[in-house]
Swiss-Prot record:
<dbReference type="InterPro" id="IPR044015">
    <property type="entry name" value="FBPase_C_dom"/>
</dbReference>
<dbReference type="GO" id="GO:0000287">
    <property type="term" value="F:magnesium ion binding"/>
</dbReference>
<comment type="subunit">
    <text>Homotetramer.</text>
</comment>
<dbReference type="Pfam" id="PF00316">
    <property type="entry name" value="FBPase"/>
</dbReference>
<feature type="binding site">
    <location>
        <position position="212"/>
    </location>
    <ligand>
        <name>substrate</name>
    </ligand>
</feature>
<dbReference type="GO" id="GO:0006094">
    <property type="term" value="P:gluconeogenesis"/>
</dbReference>
<feature type="binding site">
    <location>
        <position position="119"/>
    </location>
    <ligand>
        <name>Mg(2+) 1</name>
    </ligand>
</feature>
<dbReference type="InterPro" id="IPR000146">
    <property type="entry name" value="FBPase_class-1"/>
</dbReference>
<dbReference type="InterPro" id="IPR033391">
    <property type="entry name" value="FBPase_N"/>
</dbReference>
<keyword id="KW-0460">Magnesium</keyword>
<dbReference type="InterPro" id="IPR028343">
    <property type="entry name" value="FBPtase"/>
</dbReference>
<dbReference type="Pfam" id="PF18913">
    <property type="entry name" value="FBPase_C"/>
</dbReference>
<feature type="binding site">
    <location>
        <begin position="120"/>
        <end position="123"/>
    </location>
    <ligand>
        <name>substrate</name>
    </ligand>
</feature>
<dbReference type="InterPro" id="IPR020548">
    <property type="entry name" value="Fructose_bisphosphatase_AS"/>
</dbReference>
<comment type="similarity">
    <text>Belongs to the FBPase class 1 family.</text>
</comment>
<dbReference type="GO" id="GO:0006002">
    <property type="term" value="P:fructose 6-phosphate metabolic process"/>
</dbReference>
<dbReference type="GO" id="GO:0030388">
    <property type="term" value="P:fructose 1,6-bisphosphate metabolic process"/>
</dbReference>
Length: 359
């Protein structure tokens, strides 16, 4: 296929920069270096089992209490080493690191902060399911001599850019700089990200939802109600049939919803009281939330906009619901106004496999 008239990521960023003549170019350089990191990670992921002999990394436990696979460590190093040197970052924070990483003194200090999940869904690698990388860019505070954790604790509304790479049948980079959402496909022959999806939009309505029903007994009543209504299909209060999906890869779930609509729920529950949510606010929910909102969807905690949440911890977890606007707003309504349009609440009442007799 000829790419003669298809913009590259570099060309796209140059065109965006022309809208702001005062811009220094640091922002473009940061995005391009993150794209380089994603290319490097894509190559490592593509080797699959063939790379096991090269991944002689001892298994460790990260700050989240989760087992780090060798590719988690390698991907984290890719992001750090390919972005620390350029002079546009003041510090970075990763899901895989306990504390922020301050840019070494031998490199110029920049104006931005980078947060990232270097390899989301890495537990799926062994079964060859799509995985990805997620990133968020914030402005560093001016006039401070040293960056601290508090400087990263900015609500999602303060993000300058957000994006993810998905490593699947093709490698794609999905990006927002606050002017809609665009998607780039990696051309394996030329090694360039090419603009293939210039205006990604999420349909307002959907007949598809994604949730892990094995956690049903831990859900709050509004979530149980929503899922019950979906499962009742045409004979229920929604008057239409729904399909259910669950990939256990946030990037893969997001990409499907951006491609054809849907709603994703990883809600707050009582499975582990110390972890009322599962997904990380700063590394996952905020960047995905910005992308979804810029694509015309809605991103929520279940109660209200996730991008307006004021973070309190670097590795804070939170309930997360996002996707087609109509469905997310319905879920918010069920949380905030439980008496609206009452329906039968018992979840899966005719499906004894999931029925919770304590409800």
């Amino acid at each position: 296929m000829s790419w003669a008239h298809t913009p590259t990521l570099t060309q796209y960023l140059i065109e965006e920069r022309r809208r702001y003549p005062q811009a220094s170019g640091d922002f473009n350089a940061l995005i391009l270096d993150m794209a380089r990191a994603c290319k490097a990670i894509a190559r490592q992921v593509a080797y699959g089992a063939l790379a096991k002999s090269n991944h002689a990394v001892t298994t460790t436990i990260n700050v989240q209490g989760e087992e780090q696979k060798p590719l988690d460590v390698i991907s984290n190093e890719c992001f750090m080493r390919l972005t620390e040197w350029g002079g546009y970052l003041a510090a970075m924070a990763s899901e895989e690191m306990d504390e922020p990483y301050l840019i070494p003194e031998q490199y110029p200090r920049g104006r931005y902060l980078l947060l990232f999940d270097p390899l989301d869904g890495s537990s799926n690698i062994d079964v060859n399911v799509s995985v990805g990388s997620i990133f968020s860019v914030l402005r560093a505070p001016e006039g401070k001599t040293e960056i601290t954790v508090d400087d990263f604790l900015q609500p999602g509304t303060q993000q300058v850019a957000a994006g993810y790479a998905i490593y699947g049948p093709t490698t794609m980079l999905v990006l927002t700089v606050g002017r809609g959402v665009v998607g780039f496909t990696l051309d394996p022959d030329f090694g360039e990200f090419m603009l293939t999806h210039p205006n990604i939009r999420i349909p307002e309505s959907t007949k598809e939802f994604a949730i892990n029903t094995s956690n049903a007994r831990f859900w709050e009543p509004p979530v149980k109600r929503y899922v019950d209504e979906c499962l009742k299909g045409k004979t229920g209060p929604r008057g239409k049939d729904f399909n259910m999906r669950w990939v256990a890869s946030l990037v893969a779930e997001t990409h499907r919803i951006l491609s054809r609509g849907g709603v994703f729920l990883y809600p707050r529950d009582n499975k582990e009281p110390k972890k009322p949510g599962r997904l990380r606010l700063l590394y996952e929910c905020n960047p995905i939330g910005m992308i979804v909102e810029q694509a015309g969807g809605r991103a929520s905690t279940g109660y209200g906009p996730v991008l307006e949440v004021q973070p309190t911890e670097l590795h804070q977890r939170i309930g997360f619901v996002f996707g087609s606007r109509e469905e997310v707003e319905r879920i918010e309504q069920y949380h905030n106004d439980p008496d609206a349009s009452p329906v039968d609440l018992p979840l899966f009442a005719e499906r004894t496999l999931f029925r919770d007799e304590t409800l």
